[in-house]
Regions:
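N-terminal, positively charged nucleic-acid-binding surface of large information/translation enzymes
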Residues: 10-13, 19-107, 460
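Short, glycine/charge-rich beta-strand/loop segments that flank catalytic centers
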Residues: 68-73, 94-97, 107-122, 140-149
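Short catalytic-loop micro-motif centered on adjacent basic/acidic residues
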Residues: 64, 109-113, 229-231, 374
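Short Gly/Ser/Thr- and Asp/Glu-enriched loop/turn motifs at secondary-structure junctions
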Residues: 21, 108, 138-140, 453-457
Length: 463
């Protein structure tokens, strides 16, 4: 296997050499569950799903861990704003996240740890950091990582300490020894989630800072050293930089993650996504208008490290593209075949997840498939197309199901009504009542249903 990945830590594309060739380990930062995910959040879900598929195909064993952050100040603020109980808010939001990820065609990770289940591990890591002199506790119950104690801090983002302070809206608090120091643990008042700890008043009742959560969860489920740490480029600083600091200083002699993989920013309709501009799309809103697979294809048509300009026009084009693929698969009436992933598509993915090239090569396989279908619809083998699609998480639906999908908010005919009208038209044609047959066809066209007359049947699909 010659897999090459761009490693943010090395600023270069590198040949992927796992620590244990028989067991690849990957950790990806998951959602903070206070709100529905938007299309920007969907990008890492889809990108790291493709990487997971590729690793699973290429290595004997892969463990993919993606966490749920269910303790955070954003969650506390949303619960206060809506009057919803915090546990109810995080449980319901997590469930919606799972539904949206499934609609995007993402496989479930092997492990999905929740931050609140790992408080003991977080406290243990913080205690080690205090013992090593890398962290300090204040009288009021704050514990902070002391950034000057780590000379190599800033290596991932490539910025020095002063630049980091200027570039991040660092909270300058009186309890900090240095403006760059960041919170590992903070005190909680009675209204907020909290756990007993060794620091501060009220039995040290407090809650973890954001960064310490991922350090503790990745170590628990993947060990001190693992292969890949992934996330959006917006997490490079401060989140991933701070994870490195905590993990290396809290576990001396270890290396933490070997390869750091980050997907690029997402624009929406040519601008930064914002509710005030009307270009803020939640995945859930988009799924009312488009099938999830069209969202997935749209996200795969730009290389993962490049900025992606997401548009509804792009989604419409992706839907039309998938209509062509599924139309060909539906026309193939022979035996379904199973073959290994196509080498051309694999080669594209092994070159730093070049999904745009992989999608182009999928189009080439479609052309080959259509050539065979024109000669012999019964023996056209769909195995190459389906196995290549599987690596990208595409083309795995039943073609009939694909064409029967309709927007949630559309005033459309139901499947039973359409089937009844198609049968009535077939009878009218058999009775040579062509005026009635045309009337039914026109009514279906007006309702967004397209008919295709085959020698022995009529099949339909929605526009």
């Amino acid at each position: 296997v010659t897999l090459n990945l761009y490693n943010t830590l090395a600023r270069a594309k590198q040949a992927f050499a796992p620590i244990d060739p028989n067991h690849v380990r990957m950790y990806v930062c998951g959602p903070t569950v206070y709100d529905l995910i938007h299309i920007g959040n969907a990008r890492p879900i889809v990108i790291f799903d493709v990487l997971f598929r590729l690793l699973t195909h290429s290595f004997p064993k892969t463990t993919y861990v993606r966490n749920i952050t269910d303790v955070d100040d954003k969650i506390n603020a949303r619960a206060l704003e809506t009057g919803v109980n915090i546990r109810q808010l995080t449980t319901e939001t997590t469930e919606r996240f799972h539904q949206d990820a499934a609609a995007l065609g993402a496989l479930e990770p092997d492990v999905e740890p929740r931050a609140t289940d790992h408080i003991i591990e977080m406290i243990a890591l913080i205690e080690r950091l205090i013992e090593s002199g890398n962290a300090y506790a204040t009288d009021d119950g704050h514990v902070l990582f002391h950034v000057p104690s780590m000379p190599s801090y800033g290596r991932l983002s490539g910025r020095n300490r002063d630049e980091l302070i200027a570039g991040a809206r660092v909270e300058v608090a009186s309890y900090k020894k240095d403006p760059a120091d960041f919170v590992l643990w903070k005190p909680s008042n009675p209204e907020l989630p909290g756990w007993e700890s060794p620091w501060g008043p009220n039995k040290g009742r407090g809650r973890p800072g954001w960064h310490v959560e991922c350090s503790a969860m990745s170590q628990k489920h993947l060990g001190d050293d693992f292969d890949i740490h992934g996330g959006g480029v917006d997490l490079v600083f401060p989140h991933h930089e701070n994870e490195i600091a905590q993990s290396l200083c809290g576990n001396p002699g270890t290396h933490f993650a070997k390869y750091w993989v980050h997907n690029g920013y997402l624009m929406s309709e040519g601008e930064k996504m914002s509710k005030s501009l009307g270009n803020f799309y939640t995945v859930r809103d988009l799924l009312e208008e488009f099938p999830g697979e069209a969202l997935r294809l749209t996200l795969l048509q730009t290389h993962y490290r490049r900025p992606l300009d997401f548009t509804k026009d792009g989604l419409r084009q992706a839907k039309a593209t998938l209509d062509r693929f599924y139309g060909a698969l539906r026309d193939q009436r022979g035996v379904k075949t199973t073959v290994d992933a196509h080498p051309d598509v694999l080669a594209a993915l092994e070159d730093d997840l070049n999904t745009p090239l992989a999608v182009r090569r999928l189009h080439g396989l479609l052309d080959d498939f259509n050539d065979v279908l024109r000669r012999d619809a019964v023996n056209g083998e769909d195995g190459a197309l389906l196995s290549a699609g599987r690596m990208l998480g595409l083309l795995q639906q039943d073609p009939e199901e694909w064409f029967r999908w309709s927007p949630t908010n559309a005033n459309t005919l139901g499947e039973v009504e359409i089937d009844t009208m198609v049968a009535a038209r077939r009878k009218a044609r058999a009775d040579r009542d062509f005026a009635e047959a045309d009337r039914i066809r026109d009514e279906l066209v007006d309702a967004g249903v397209i008919l295709e007359d085959k020698p022995d049947e009529t099949i339909w699909r929605r526009k």
